[in-house]
């Protein structure tokens, strides 16, 4: 994700065995019988199910006064319960769609239900109340798991247990008007199957003595003890799906809710992880400071617990797979130095270093992010979208050849590169299903799209939570819309941390499983280029790492740390030069300043959530100031030129070759 201006976002409001292992778990949510077979590349066919789709509008919750304690808890409780219910209901088929975030939900609902859409022939049933919704889907849950607000982490435990045991999460609340009392004490009550507090109402997790139900001494933190209990009783015992985790804010949100817009609690994101029986967690990553939500814990307790969770998950699959973690550091609320008029997140580390540190820890355990960063991090209905029937392959525009480069005027009549500066726009950041779901409609409806080459960095693993969006974009591409993998492939991790020594885990190399994870997704989405490899503060790619990328990303990589360009085993590579921001004129000026070095001729510039109209204005401003001396091309053409440049006879006589091999 790598957001140098992260606060601006808020202001805008395997081997075959590995693949079979993933498929076994994936069948919880997408059995083979529901997958439509492709009629041809990029097209699917299938028979619509006769089961109706239920639509429930939950947007009434945003009318509540969150400044009122009771209404704030209602907002949390109902959002939490409905997200869990949706995950259970949609586990094997798309049955329930929640209207939660009006603009994106209405847009994608409209796309699915319009003539010719995925749901065009499906019966739609609108349910008007929460009670009616629970009654309709009573067969999908066995009871309730009750959690303890005094230990906010138990909200995430409840979500995890809900997915594993087919339960609904309920916050214990003795007040008569609470959701708990309404569902537990009323006629036809939902039975309580698991209690995360004692029968007498005392805390189950106290941070003293032994961790309940184990012989393990307490960590001294009720928060950490709760997660360590979960690891022992659900992760190590095989109840959870080791291939999916979710890093989402726990119920501490009830204290710090003013830090960001209400939907940034990201409860609506939990449905997918619950559907897949994954683990939900919220833990800090720094061992040199205590977290704002647990200031009395000893230093390092949160990150030690996180590493314990990741190691237990890694051990479940014997290291033979990539663990995918939806969500992101809740930086506006916890674990960073973020400060707003209403809240201080309590840390000393800025957002980007915290992101990088978290990425390093994940990477050392073969885990990657689907990085739902706050500001645009909320996403509803991923458990529904996951059932969208994808084709086996989505071809994109034909990759450039020497003949194509010549036709574009990039090679002269002698086959040499025309001497000028070549620039490509890396259009990010789409390493998050939530960001794609929120931003894609505006980007794809921009009237300037298609006028200049843009290289869209849609991570291919987003097809697991938002296949509809990826397919929709591909089906509406222009000849100037190019697609590359974003940070750092089929998921955001630091690939340098896949090679030993892996300082946070000491585990053997994960490069082979990373390659096996990426390859089928690259093939499905016709990707042969990785537009950004984020190394953060971690180690650079080793020779083995470069070789792995050469296998599944043979048309090139763009790296964050590397300050040179070259070709490795036939794979060209370049450094990412700079992030473009500000007005188009300011961005054009930055390009002019960055490209003054006469020894370099190929440049990649990154933008974050910038529209096609903005990029067009930047390109026009560059042309006005530089004329034909700077040429904007797509990333595939740019890196093909780098490969051509490796051949002495194809380089202009005026250029000095300075590549590393």
Where are the language model's segments positioned?
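Bacterial N-terminal signal peptides
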Residues: 15-27
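Boundary at the C-terminal end of the N-terminal hydrophobic targeting segment
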Residues: 29-31, 35-38
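Substrate-binding cleft of extracellular glycoside hydrolase catalytic domains
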Residues: 459-520, 524-527
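Bacterial N-terminal signal peptides that target proteins for export
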Residues: 2-18
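Preference for solvent-exposed, low-hydrophobicity sequence contexts
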Residues: 37-392
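Catalytic grooves of carbohydrate-active enzymes
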Residues: 302-330, 423, 427-437, 441, ...
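Short loop/turn segments at strand-loop or loop-helix junctions that form parts
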Residues: 147-150, 327-330, 420-421, 425-430, ...
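Active-site beta->alpha N-cap acidic-glycine motif
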Residues: 387-474
